[in-house]
Regions:
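Conserved catalytic or regulatory cores that recognize and/or transform ribose-phosphate-containing ligands
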Residues: 17-192
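Bacterial N-terminal signal peptides that target proteins for export
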Residues: 1-13
Length: 192
C-alpha cells in the first residue's frame, strides 16, 4: 500500500503536468477546402474565399501562395481553383460539373467572412468581376487589381463607389486578409 505522502506527491505532479499541457499553445493551421469538397457545417472558425484570377488554370496559382501565408492561422480557406478542372465541361447550367462548381462558389462566397478578389495582370476574370459585383456592398471584400488587369478601371470605380477595401501589392493583400480574419475571429463567426 502506498503512503499518503507519495500519493499526494503523485497527484500534485499529475496536476502540474495537466496544467502544463492545457497551457501549451495550440498549433494553428488552416483547413483548406477546395472545390468541390463540401463546405464545413457549424465550424466557428473564420472563413476566407480566395476569388479572382484562375483563367481555367492559366493564371498563376496565387491561391496557393496566399494559403501558405495563412498557414499559422486557425481559419478555413475556401479555394475555388480545382486541380481536376476539365476544359471540355460546357459552361452551361445543364453541365453537371460546371453547375457543381458554380453552386459551390456561390455557397462558399455566402459563407465567407472575408472575400479576396485578386485580378492578375494579363487576365480577364469575368466571373470574378461578377462575384465582386455581387458582394461589393457586403463589407467582406478585399481587392487587389494591379496595373495590367483587363478591367482595372471598372474594379477601381466600383470599389470606390461601394467602399470596397483595395490594396496595391500582394504583401498588402496578405496583411489585410490576416487582419480581417483576426478581426472576424475576435468578433465570432456567427456574430454577423
Amino acid at each position: 500500500m502506498k503512503s499518503p505522502a507519495l500519493l499526494s506527491a503523485l497527484l500534485s505532479s499529475l496536476a502540474v503536468l495537466t496544467a502544463c499541457i492545457a497551457a501549451a499553445p495550440a498549433t494553428a493551421q488552416p483547413t483548406v477546402v477546395i472545390s468541390p469538397q463540401p463546405l464545413p457545417i457549424d465550424d466557428a472558425r473564420p472563413r476566407v474565399f480566395l476569388g479572382g484570377s484562375i483563367d481555367m488554370g492559366g493564371a498563376p496559382d496565387w491561391q496557393a501562395a496566399l494559403t501558405r501565408a495563412l498557414s499559422d492561422m486557425d481559419v478555413t480557406v475556401l479555394n475555388p481553383r480545382r486541380p481536376d478542372w476539365n476544359l471540355a465541361w460546357r459552361p452551361e447550367a445543364d453541365e453537371p460539373e460546371f453547375r457543381r462548381q458554380v453552386e459551390w462558389e456561390l455557397a462558399a462566397l455566402e459563407s465567407a467572412d472575408v472575400i479576396v478578389m485578386y485580378f492578375a495582370p494579363g487576365t480577364q476574370s469575368p466571373i470574378s468581376l461578377l462575384e465582386m459585383g455581387l458582394h461589393a456592398r457586403g463589407g467582406k471584400l478585399i481587392v487587389l487589381a494591379p496595373e495590367g488587369f483587363w478591367r482595372k478601371g471598372n474594379v477601381d470605380i466600383t470599389a470606390r463607389a461601394y467602399g470596397v477595401r483595395q490594396v496595391q501589392t500582394m504583401d498588402e493583400l496578405t496583411a489585410a486578409v490576416r487582419q480581417a480574419l483576426a478581426d472576424a475571429a475576435e468578433k465570432g463567426r456567427f456574430a454577423r
